[in-house]
């Protein structure tokens, strides 16, 4: 590898002495770690906090899975890489398109640039929706790259993933999508890849099924973090550089009777502006709606008549639980969003509220526990835990989760 590698106008070290490992622990906020630590369930993470770094940083807005995973692996916000939700809307065609195809990426990943410089890359993600985005720019024909998901671990091939027969290799069956097992598979695979494949860079991305269902301190949540800690201990070998962060936090979003706490914005705008005059887009929506019912804290709104923007904003602002209501240009500048993939208006809800489209459009039949969700400013703050001291923080300003690889790679040079 060269002495330095430039990725999206940021300079990263080219010569690594150990493996740089970043883990995106989906849906994690500091309270999960704190509660598990009180019961002495996380000795390895506690050691990181004591001897390395225990920081709180911002995730990208919207605080959803796709934008933040891609921010972490490009080192930049979605204004640069283009992935600003799980899906987006094209007004000219009326299409709502899942944003999991690499054609929507506008910037290379750190993996791609390091791979092109000769590095070995290992990536394991819980859900397959991220896999093609994460592996974009990698080739799997020279034994230098591996990328697969827990969800479709039984469908891997050398050509597509750089590995085959993962379940036999790992000794674990394909986990249920809605289970702790999906994330445990990621961690177990990461440990085995570290010791056998010996990558220069490794990225492990879990799923937030547990965090959507269980609050910090609940027994199931504590069990999850104890499991995670065990694998962290197995990754913390040979002076490897490890940073644990998250794509977003999580907040309770239910009424006292257990039903979801939501403002159905499409219904409101249909009444105030007229039918078919607006389109409310909820970028949290993806194929895995069982645990959130497509309700999150962020929405973007397209208007048929652009002259109605101020009127629409004034109507939305009548609801105190919609805390942020901004025009496209103001919101995109403030939160580093791609203007052409956002609507005319951008909204974020209060801490315990979500934004829905039409009440009849949301299916809660599979939502067994009180709703916990994310997407806005109240779920933005996430942990940033390093096993090594960071001596060269670029600024005293708050860091972002997408600084993780910058500091993990720096830590791998010593």
Locate predicted features.
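Active-site-proximal N-terminal segment of extracellular/periplasmic enzymes that hydrolyze or transfer
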Residues: 2-53
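A long, amphipathic alpha-helix that forms part
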Residues: 14-15, 179-244, 248-252
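Secreted, luminal/periplasmic, and some membrane-associated catalytic domains
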Residues: 18, 88-101, 107, 212-215, ...
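Short catalytic/ligand-binding loop motif for oxyanion handling, primarily in non-cytosolic enzymes
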Residues: 30-32, 65, 129-135, 210-214, ...
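Short, structured active-site-proximal loop/turn typified by the sulfatase FGly-forming signature C/S-X-P-X-R
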Residues: 34-78, 122
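His/Asp/Glu-rich, glycine-adjacent segments
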Residues: 75-215, 291, 297, 308-312, ...
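A short beta-strand-to-alpha-helix junction
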Residues: 105, 190, 223, 278-295, ...
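Low-complexity, glycine/alanine/valine/leucine- and proline-rich hydrophobic stretches
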Residues: 349-410
């Amino acid at each position: 590898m060269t002495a330095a590698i430039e990725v999206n106008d940021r300079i990263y070290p080219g010569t690594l002495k150990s493996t740089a490992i970043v883990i995106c622990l989906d849906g994690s906020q500091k309270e999960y770690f704190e509660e598990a630590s009180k019961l002495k369930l996380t000795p390895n993470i506690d050691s990181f906090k004591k001897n390395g770094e225990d920081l709180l940083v911002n995730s990208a807005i919207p605080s959803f899975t796709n934008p933040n995973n891609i921010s972490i692996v490009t080192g930049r916000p979605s204004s640069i890489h283009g992935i600003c939700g799980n899906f987006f809307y094209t007004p000219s065609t009326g299409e709502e398109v899942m944003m999991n195809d690499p054609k929507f990426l506008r910037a290379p990943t750190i993996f791609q640039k390091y791979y092109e410089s000769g590095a070995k890359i290992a990536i394991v993600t819980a859900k397959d929706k991220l896999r093609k985005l994460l592996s974009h720019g990698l080739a799997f024909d020279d034994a230098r790259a591996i990328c697969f998901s827990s969800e479709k671990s039984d469908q891997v091939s050398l050509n597509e993933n750089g590995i085959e027969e993962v379940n036999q290799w790992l000794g674990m069956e394909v986990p249920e999508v809605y289970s702790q097992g999906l994330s445990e598979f990621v961690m177990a695979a990461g440990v085995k890849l570290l010791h056998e494949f010996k990558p220069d860079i490794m990225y492990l991305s879990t799923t937030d099924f547990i965090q959507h269902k269980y609050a910090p301190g609940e027994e199931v949540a504590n069990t999850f973090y104890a499991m995670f800690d065990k694998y962290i201990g197995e990754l913390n070998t040979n002076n490897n550089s490890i940073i644990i962060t998250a794509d977003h936090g999580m907040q309770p979003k239910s009424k006292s009777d257990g039903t979801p706490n939501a403002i159905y914005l499409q219904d409101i705008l249909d009444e105030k502006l007229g039918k078919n005059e607006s389109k409310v887009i909820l970028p949290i929506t993806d194929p895995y709606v069982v645990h959130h019912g497509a309700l999150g804290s962020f929405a973007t709104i397209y208007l048929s008549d652009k002259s109605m923007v101020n009127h629409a904003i004034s109507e939305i602002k009548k609801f105190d639980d919609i805390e942020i209501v901004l025009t496209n240009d103001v919101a995109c500048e403030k939160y580093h969003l791609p203007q052409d993939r956002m609507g005319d208006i951008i909204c974020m809800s209060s801490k315990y509220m979500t934004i829905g489209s039409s009440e009849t459009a949301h299916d809660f039949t599979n939502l067994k526990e009180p709703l916990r969700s994310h997407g806005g400013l109240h779920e933005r703050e996430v942990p940033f835990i390093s096993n090594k001291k960071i001596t060269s923080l670029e600024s005293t300003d708050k860091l972002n989760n997408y600084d993780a690889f910058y500091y993990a790679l720096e830590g791998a040079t010593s």
